[in-house]
């Protein structure tokens, strides 16, 4: 849903993309939170934010685009290693497609988290997407 207007994102907006070689550094990643569910537990909660850069937002006619993924997992690696692996795999997936769009980023993230990383139990997605009104 577009947070500015409250309208649902259309399929055309979801599939609207730009070639990956037209935008430098199209995505950036940030660890928002990494903690155990409760002390002594082996399950961790890691929240990763995927941010679209200015050039990509401009090409896709967006004002703001944040995708927050909350991972519930049993991975024992550090949060930086999880982020590095996730971002490398996502860029590899997007390079193979050749086009970056919201839909492709979401498909790539779900492919990596459910197919490649085997210790991920559950993923929840929240987003903040705002399209330009003019």
Curated annotation (Swiss-Prot):
Record's keyword terms, sorted: Host-virus interaction
Any single Pfam family the record assigns to this protein: Gemini_AL3
Coiled coil: none
Gene Ontology biological-process annotations: viral process
InterPro entries: Gemini_AL3 (IPR000657)
Assembly: Homooligomer. Interacts with the replication-associated protein (REP). Interacts with host proliferating cell nuclear antigen (PCNA). Interacts with host retinoblastoma-related protein 1 (RBR1), and may thereby deregulate the host cell cycle. Oligomerization and interaction with PCNA are necessary for optimal replication enhancement.
Similarity comment text for this entry: Belongs to the geminiviridae replication enhancer protein family.
Role this protein plays: Increases viral DNA accumulation. Enhances infectivity and symptom expression.
Protein name in UniProt: Replication enhancer protein
Species name: Mungbean yellow mosaic virus (strain Vigna)
Organism placement in taxonomy: Viruses, Monodnaviria, Shotokuvirae, Cressdnaviricota, Repensiviricetes
């Amino acid at each position: 849903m577009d947070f500015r207007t409250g309208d649902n994102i259309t399929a055309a907006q979801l599939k609207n993309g730009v070639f990956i070689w037209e935008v430098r550094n199209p995505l950036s990643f940030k660890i928002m939170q990494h903690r155990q569910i409760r002390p002594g537990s082996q399950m961790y909660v890691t929240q990763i934010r995927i941010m679209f850069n200015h050039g990509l937002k401009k090409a896709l006619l967006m004002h703001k685009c944040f995708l927050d993924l909350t991972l519930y997992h049993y991975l024992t690696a550090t949060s930086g290693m999880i982020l590095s692996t996730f971002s490398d795999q996502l860029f590899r997936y997007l390079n193979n497609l050749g086009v970056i769009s919201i839909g492709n980023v979401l498909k790539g993230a779900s492919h990596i988290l459910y197919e490649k990383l085997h210790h991920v139990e559950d993923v929840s997605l929240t987003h903040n997407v705002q399209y330009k009104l003019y």
